[in-house]
Curated annotation (Swiss-Prot):
It comes from Candida glabrata (strain ATCC 2001 / BCRC 20586 / JCM 3761 / NBRC 0622 / NRRL Y-65 / CBS 138). Its EC number is 2.3.2.23. It catalyses: S-ubiquitinyl-[E1 ubiquitin-activating enzyme]-L-cysteine + [E2 ubiquitin-conjugating enzyme]-L-cysteine = [E1 ubiquitin-activating enzyme]-L-cysteine + S-ubiquitinyl-[E2 ubiquitin-conjugating enzyme]-L-cysteine. The lineage of its organism: Eukaryota, Fungi, Dikarya, Ascomycota, Saccharomycotina. Residues 148-167 are annotated as: Disordered. It is found in: Cytoplasm; Nucleus. Pathway: Protein modification; protein ubiquitination. Belongs to the ubiquitin-conjugating enzyme family. SMART domains: UBCc. Catalyzes the covalent attachment of ubiquitin to other proteins. Plays a role in transcription regulation by catalyzing the monoubiquitination of histone H2B to form H2BK123ub1. H2BK123ub1 gives a specific tag for epigenetic transcriptional activation and is also a prerequisite for H3K4me and H3K79me formation. Also involved in postreplication repair of UV-damaged DNA, in N-end rule-dependent protein degradation and in sporulation. Its main location: cytoplasm. This is Ubiquitin-conjugating enzyme E2 2.
Length: 167
């Protein structure tokens, strides 16, 4: 059934395929356009550089009038990310407007890697280290970057096994 939300999500998907912003990718699940997998690559010249961070975006029928529920699936050590992966970002709450699309959501999240907001911490430990002990903060972030590589390699191994099951 085609609804305004589903039509908009198909437009968002077309845009992501044709003109994806650097360092982000996203696509709906094959059987559900309302649920998307996404990935953000850590930007250069940040402690997150070259990390591969997976996210889940869940939309409801009120999209684009309401923001999606977005969370990191990859472990993330960041002042604005809760332990459960949920993200403290104004455009996902009180500053949402229907002009935002999947690409702009992901680039806004990616910009948090460059510019964390320790004044509005979701992770108090990360915010404190970011403000007061930058070298310890960077060390912890680099650990999550390495873990992101391991997790993605594990996922690739799992998908290889799935492919073998199909044969």
């Amino acid at each position: 059934m085609s609804t305004p939300a589903r039509r908009r999500l198909m437009r968002d998907f077309k845009r992501m395929k044709e003109d994806s912003p650097p360092g982000v990718s996203a696509s709906p699940l094959p059987d559900n356009v309302m649920v998307w997998n996404a990935m953000i690559i850590g930007p250069a010249d940040t402690p997150y550089e070259d990390g591969t961070f997976r996210l889940l975006l869940e939309f409801d029928e009120d999209y684009p009038n309401k923001p999606p529920h977005v969370k990191f699936l990859s472990e993330m050590f960041h002042p604005n990310v809760y332990a459960n992966g949920e993200i403290c970002l104004d455009i996902l709450q009180n500053r949402w407007t229907p002009t935002y699309d999947v690409a702009s959501i992901l680039t806004s999240i990616q910009s948090l890697f460059n510019d964390p907001n320790p004044a509005s911490p979701a992770n108090v430990e990360a915010a404190t280290l970011f403000k007061d002990h930058k070298s310890q903060y960077i060390k912890r972030v680099k650990e999550t970057v390495e873990k992101s590589w391991e997790d993605n390699m594990d996922d690739m191994d799992d998908s290889d096994e799935d492919d073998e099951d199909d044969e």
